[in-house]
Amino acid sequence: MDAEIEVKKEEKTKRKSNIELLRIICIIMIIAHHYTIHGGLGQYYTLGINKKVAFVQILSIWGKMGCNIFMIITGYFMIKSKAKPKKLILLLLEMIFYSLGIYAIFCIFHLATFSKDALMKSIFPMFFQNWFLVDYIIIYCLIPYFNEMLQKLDKTTFKKFLGVLFIIGFCIPTLINKTIVNFNELGVLIVMYFVGAYIRLHTEEKSDKKYFWLMIAFDVALVGLVLLWDFIGVKFQEVTYIKEATRFAQINSAVVFGGAVYTFLFFKNNINFSSKVINFLSSSTLGVYLIHDNPYIRGWVWNKISPGKAYMSSNMILVHAVAKILIIFIICTIIDKIRIFVFEKPIDKLMDKNKR
């Protein structure tokens, strides 16, 4: 997720911004997902569904795709790079900084109760918080072994390997809404790492209009399936369909898989530009994730500060959602830039100095 962790700088003169823009879009997709999930808006998924509820459903379906794209990006860059202990240490320090810092602030202002258990969870967030970051750390530690294995596979064998994983881990769960093996989030993210590695090793980097249309096709299919399930639920007065309308947006959905792959291919091959602003903002996507999805911030920002539920009876729900998502992204980015300037850069320089 973090540009400093995932990207090996390939252009010493002018770094391209296509993938960096994609990172920003992905974190916004994840914030939008949390707007619905953590904002408690799922309670409105009833037979009384209307356009506003359908909008909220559609807003929620992009988060897992964003996670999958982040891991494709990691696989794409890291398959030809080495996992460095320094980068892992900086990641762990960032996690602890936000986890412990936010907990301390909440205790100081009496927004949380101090306890030894909560303190330990804040000191060791890699074991208790942020499933995505925990899985990311595990995968990062396994990168040397993954790369050694994947680089030995020829293109045909690699493609067959991915095909088997796709059928078992994505197609079957999507069709029957049930996993046949214990293919959890970690397993899915590992497959997405493999996909990114395959794209880097065995595909050409050339612009192709089909990537755009395939990206649109999977996105439209995802939205269409949500609306279809809503329609079936209303038609046959079965609320279960409405409550499960977002099942096709799960992290192991074949539709989400396709959308993630072709979104990445579209941005990688069809978009080519350089922007210092985009590159500057994208390096804080991890910080944005850690701040806004912190367990203390989560309940506070979604349910205490201008909650989305207060706008479900208003025509302003669309404006409110967009505004709140963007404000969260901007504020979290500013906070992370301060952290980088005050803490991370000095630590980074100190580590480099001691290394010499």
Map each language-model feature to its residues.
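Short, Lys/Arg-rich, polar N-terminal cytosolic tail immediately upstream
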Residues: 1-18
